[in-house]
């Protein structure tokens, strides 16, 4: 989690959030993680967002406070980025926002819209990738045959390998695909409003104004596309069928697909290769009562381990 927060901070604002250095979850990280819990409610029941401003119910009140604090964190990161550019005369490194400013976004977007997008970038690029990475490492450590096959593929990597060397590693990519299928970061529905005139969908007419949604969790467990769907089985991706492609949407789909999907795959490949090159004998720990139940998915807006921990024995 600390790594993904620092990566998205560096790419978006030109600086990390200091999580790797401190090794401590501060309030800002906890707040962004908490958004995953209330995000599902807001996605399915958008009226709740409005009611939370007026109802004295603790969970709604706390969610609103957290939301506004994350806006403040995003604005602070934007302000620090702007100050560095002003002091240096130019951006010391390319960032998401330096590209937006170059494109004249500040002339099109209001300051509030820029801040809101900054907040979305942090939310979308941090806890999501971190949760997928946790499940990937856990699953590979838990299944010896999968780990052996991955280690065999990684044998030829030099110690200071780069991303280009990982792009064409078939089994590594199979593991990433299977992780995104079984442990997709965003399992809940993504609501869409039917436009004027209505729409025909799978032989059914949907009237204008109705809300329709797709749910990755169910699609990714379609037994026709994925036999034995609850099994973590990367080998299934060695012979990808069209039905598998049609039922796979870890990043959404269409024109609204996730902006950071390529970044997520880059991080998953790099971290997986580095972790198992460094700790080839890693296994799932049983310390402190750690067990499979800790890793059962808790489904909010994001998928997270219900035990909120994943203990790994690095030395096997």
Language-model regions, residue ranges each:
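Cytochrome P450 heme-binding "Cys pocket" and the immediately downstream C-terminal segment
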Residues: 144-146, 243-244, 261-301, 305
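Cytochrome P450 heme-thiolate monooxygenase catalytic core
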Residues: 1-133
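Hydrophobic, repeat-rich solenoid/adaptor surfaces of innate immune receptors and signaling proteins
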Residues: 12, 133-137, 216, 268, ...
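Cytochrome P450 I-helix active-site segment
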Residues: 24-34, 90-96, 139-186, 202, ...
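Short amphipathic alpha-helical face segments that pack within enzyme cores
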Residues: 3-7, 131-135, 263-274
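C-terminal helix/juxtamembrane-tail motif
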Residues: 300-316
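Conserved cytochrome P450 K-helix/beta-meander segment immediately N-terminal to the heme-binding cysteine loop
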Residues: 195, 214-241
């Amino acid at each position: 989690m600390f790594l993904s927060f620092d990566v998205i901070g560096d790419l978006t604002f030109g600086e990390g959030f200091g999580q790797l250095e401190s090794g401590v979850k501060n309030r800002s990280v906890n707040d962004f993680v908490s958004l995953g819990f209330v995000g599902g409610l807001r996605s399915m029941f958008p009226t709740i967002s409005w009611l939370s401003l007026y109802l004295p119910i603790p969970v709604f009140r706390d969610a609103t406070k957290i939301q506004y604090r994350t806006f403040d964190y995003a604005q602070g990161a934007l302000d620090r980025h702007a100050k560095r550019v002003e002091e240096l005369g130019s951006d010391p490194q390319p960032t998401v926002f330096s590209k937006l400013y170059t494109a004249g976004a500040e002339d099109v977007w209001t300051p509030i819209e820029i801040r809101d997008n900054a907040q979305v970038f942090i939310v979308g690029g941090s806890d999501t990738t971190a949760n997928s990475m946790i499940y990937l490492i856990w699953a590979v450590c838990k299944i010896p045959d999968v780990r052996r096959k991955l280690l065999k593929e990684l044998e030829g990597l030099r110690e200071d390998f780069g991303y280009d060397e990982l792009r064409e590693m078939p089994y590594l990519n199979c593991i990433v695909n299977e992780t995104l299928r079984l442990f997709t970061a965003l399992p809940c529905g993504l609501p869409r409003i039917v436009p004027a005139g209505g729409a025909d969908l799978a032989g059914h007419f949907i009237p204008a104004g109705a809300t329709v949604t797709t749910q990755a969790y169910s699609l990714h467990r379609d037994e026709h596309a994925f036999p034995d769907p609850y099994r973590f089985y990367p080998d299934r991706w060695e012979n990808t069928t069209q039905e598998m492609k049609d039922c796979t949407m870890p990043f959404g789909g269409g024109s609204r697909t996730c902006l950071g999907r390529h970044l997520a795959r880059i991080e998953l490949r790099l971290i997986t290769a580095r972790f198992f090159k460094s700790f080839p004998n890693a296994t799932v720990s049983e310390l402190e009562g750690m067990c499979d139940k800790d890793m059962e998915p808790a489904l909010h807006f994001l998928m997270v381990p219900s035990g909120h921990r994943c203990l790994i024995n690095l030395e096997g």
